[in-house]
């Protein structure tokens, strides 16, 4: 069940970084911060039942990348609450993934994320790995905020599952050490925000959305970019906070209130809306579907943020199919 760990932490880390307080939610955060830190300690302890054998599978590279994505979003509450031995063991585990050659596609970003984690938490990196991931994705950019997954364009949600979020995170780390990459970071921000704008238009009035491409069992992770744009206060100028909150809430309700979404023990099932085991791929097991936690990133915004306080307003598809006035969509110029 290793594959569920990094994915889940990546999604809940911004919320946990808000830290404990005396509210009911703050007390819940305190509980989960302690659980995550204890779990991570056990995951790298060779004597613990929950130990992850770093040589067991290439999925340790994927898990490490998502885990680092989460730790970079919660440096105080998660990384800062790990003891020195656990931190060092995690760093050594991440180093072990360097023997795993990534595919010439979005997997380049998994390796780049690991190097960013090693630099951020261990003060060393192999910058060639990062440079290859950045330059390759620049070459694979197809226009209007969309990247190819490798040289070819794939009509799926990998721009949201992996590509945009990890490329943005990698560039944010890199510019701390090399300001010449600021140009590429600025360019990625524009593409990121444009993709968020597209995503908002894909959510139908009932919260459903087009089921396209592989890995659709990642459910709400399909809208990670839209949620991250809200979290980072980088929503497109065409969108109001209240309409994004409404759209994402409708999407989450449509997915998670469907009977069969959870099994009798409370674990997620494979499927888009309910249990649909035929949607499992050769690389996709039940733990993988916890990538859906990345659809909850706005929970990292405090209760007084405009995302929560702004009045609800209809999102684009509601206005469009109610005969109301709504703005036309415009492609982003290169």
Segments (PLM) and residue ranges:
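Extreme N-terminal leader/anchor segments
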Residues: 1-41, 45, 323-334
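Long, repeat-rich segments with strong aromatic
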Residues: 11, 153-270, 277-304
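Aromatic-lined, polymer-binding surfaces characteristic
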Residues: 12-14, 29-189, 201-224
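Structured alpha-helical bundle/scaffold domains in large eukaryotic membrane-trafficking regulators
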Residues: 20, 24, 79, 178, ...
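Glycine- and acidic
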Residues: 21, 49-53, 277
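Alpha-helix boundary/capping detector
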Residues: 93, 225, 318-322
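Extended hydrophobic packing segments that form well-structured cores
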Residues: 297-334
């Amino acid at each position: 069940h290793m594959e569920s760990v990094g994915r889940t932490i990546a999604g809940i880390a911004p919320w946990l970084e808000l830290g404990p307080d005396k509210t009911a939610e703050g007390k819940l955060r305190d509980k989960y911060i302690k659980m995550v830190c204890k779990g991570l300690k056990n995951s790298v302890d060779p004597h613990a039942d929950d130990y992850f054998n770093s040589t067991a599978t290439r999925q340790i590279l994927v898990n490490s990348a998502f885990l680092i994505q989460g730790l970079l979003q919660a440096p105080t509450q998660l990384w800062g609450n790990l003891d020195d031995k656990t931190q060092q063991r995690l760093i050594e585990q991440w180093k072990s993934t360097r023997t795993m050659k990534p595919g010439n596609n979005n997997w380049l970003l998994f390796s780049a994320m690991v190097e960013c984690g090693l630099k951020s938490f261990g003060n060393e990196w192999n910058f060639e790995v990062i440079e290859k991931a950045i330059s390759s994705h620049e070459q694979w950019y197809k226009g209007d905020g969309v990247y190819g997954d490798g040289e070819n364009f794939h009509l799926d949600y990998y721009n949201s599952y992996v590509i945009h979020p990890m490329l943005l995170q990698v560039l944010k780390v890199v510019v701390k050490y090399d300001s010449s990459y600021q140009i590429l970071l600025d360019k990625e921000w524009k593409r990121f925000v444009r993709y968020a704008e597209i995503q908002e238009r894909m959510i139908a009035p009932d919260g459903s959305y087009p089921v396209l491409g592989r890995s659709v069992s990642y459910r709400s992770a399909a809208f990670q970019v839209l949620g991250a744009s809200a979290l980072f206060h980088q929503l497109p100028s065409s969108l109001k906070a209240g309409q994004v909150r409404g759209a994402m809430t409708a999407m989450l309700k449509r997915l998670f209130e469907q009977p069969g979404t959870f099994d009798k023990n409370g674990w997620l099932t494979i499927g888009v809306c309910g249990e649909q085991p035929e949607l499992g791929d050769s690389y996709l097991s039940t733990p993988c579907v916890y990538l859906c936690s990345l659809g909850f990133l706005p929970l990292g915004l405090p209760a007084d943020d405009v995302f929560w306080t702004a009045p609800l307003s209809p999102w684009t598809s509601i206005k469009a199919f109610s005969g109301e006035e709504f703005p036309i969509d415009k492609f982003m110029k290169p």
